[in-house]
């Protein structure tokens, strides 16, 4: 868990510092966002062996289980294969609620995809 201090104090998104840890992945700081900085460094070290990253979240308005994924016009099927398979195998996941778009450039999903080229990064 990346944000236990914020959650313990009732924050759903922000750490005690007031920073949303899912909006700093594009430019991390060892001093300001140490947890994200070190997680990102570990992912960078193992990017060749990494085939899937799941960024687990709750949603403030949407109910149920679904995926948010990245988008590639040249390879639509492979970007949707994992979510499609999970949705077929587990009735708790609903494919019609999944979204495959660009997203926020500073989110883990988008920043790691842009920097490392790992296609299978999903917010769940």
Region annotations inferred by a language model:
Residues 1-123:
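Structured catalytic-domain cores with a bias toward divalent-metal coordination
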């Amino acid at each position: 868990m990346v944000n236990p201090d914020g959650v313990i104090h009732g924050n759903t998104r922000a750490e005690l510092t007031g920073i949303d840890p899912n909006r700093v992945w594009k430019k991390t700081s060892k001093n300001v966002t140490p947890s994200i900085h070190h997680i990102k460094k570990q992912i960078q070290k193992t990017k060749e062996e990494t085939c899937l990253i799941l960024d687990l979240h709750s949603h403030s308005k949407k109910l149920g289980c679904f995926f948010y994924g990245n988008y590639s016009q040249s390879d639509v099927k492979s970007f949707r294969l994992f979510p499609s398979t999970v949705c077929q195998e587990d009735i708790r996941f609903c494919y019609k609620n999944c979204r495959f778009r660009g997203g926020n450039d500073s989110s883990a999903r988008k920043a790691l995809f842009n920097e490392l080229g790992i296609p299978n990064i999903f917010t769940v």
